[in-house]
């Protein structure tokens, strides 16, 4: 069964448990109440259930490079505690940037980390791919370098996106 509802309303799901919960690219960045959302996730999972959360962390090398064009608003927007205005397909909303450490801290009592991967540390983000249109070899090399480095600290926790995969602890693991 697939259900779609706002993150803040996860408490409405009381009758089911799931094997896997997935948050699409940056979806969790749209709530200012992420700690409340994260607290609800373990209760929605079966034992050994997994989550895959894709967030936009506060550190994005490509956005920080805007400092060289003196565009400080873009270069540091992810560091704002009150979030930053964002727009997708002419819809404006507030986006909040959370660190992988924050998410893990809120979930670790109930969950184990399985994998982390940073995306777009070396490879430019999608909105900059037009610079690589006529450079397929460079694009391929950047993609491979990004995939490799994204699996190693500190690149696991930074980038345009960060993927965090966790598994719900078993009853035995809680007793340890």
Regions found by a protein language model. Name each.
Residues 50-80:
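Conserved class I S-adenosyl-L-methionine
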Residues 19-34:
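A short SAM/SAH-binding and catalytic strip from SAM-dependent methyltransferases
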Residues 105, 115-176:
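A C-terminal cap/extension of S-adenosyl-L-methionine-dependent methyltransferases
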Residues 35-50:
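A short glycine-rich, Lys/Arg-flanked "PGG" loop and its adjoining helix->strand segment in the class I
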Residues 11-21:
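A short acidic, Gly/Pro-enriched loop at the edge of an enzyme's catalytic core
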Residues 63, 85-102:
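Acceptor-substrate binding/catalytic loop of class I
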Residues 1-9:
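Conserved SAM-binding strand-loop segment of SAM-dependent methyltransferases
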